[in-house]
Amino acid sequence: MEYAILFLPLIGALIGYVIKVFGDIYSEIVTTLFVSAAAILSIILFYNGIVYEDYGNYKIYQWIASGKFVVNASINIDPLSSIMLVVVSLVSALVHIYSIGYMSHDPDKPRFMCYLSLFTFAMFTLVVSDNFLQLFFGWEGVGLCSYLLIGFWYKKESANDAAIKAFIVNRIGDFGLAIGIFLIFFFFGSI
């Protein structure tokens, strides 16, 4: 279930992008259903955590191995990450549902819905990361998707300017986060 929660928005974004050739509505339905399914599973996961204390660390694969230094791509489920999964997934599902009507006039709806699903996947990655390197990649994914969503109407100069400003501000945060991760590795030998 933990793997499904993390990867459903990514799979929904990919399928939504591919099936847009059959019509905008299919892309909207797929991305919204996949994110909504992740929201339902997040609520179940949260319930299992509260009632059965069903928390854990779920390894996806070994990412980096160099001597004694090993970094796994893992899903860490604890009380904080489970409640954040519920918050992020419910808000994202509601935004997806609202966007179906809000973007009804736009010919690029499938692209917007795919960006939203990718944003949800990046937020999930950020929330359930087991180490600082994975957290950094989730942070970068959120920054990239923010840039893409802010600059969605790229033909408008104001949207492009706002996207570039957001991108620059995110780079400042990235720099600070990267320095912090480097210092943690330098002093503790682990991330």
Description of each model-found segment:
Residues 1-191:
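...captures the hydrophobic TM-helix bundle architecture rather than a specific catalytic motif
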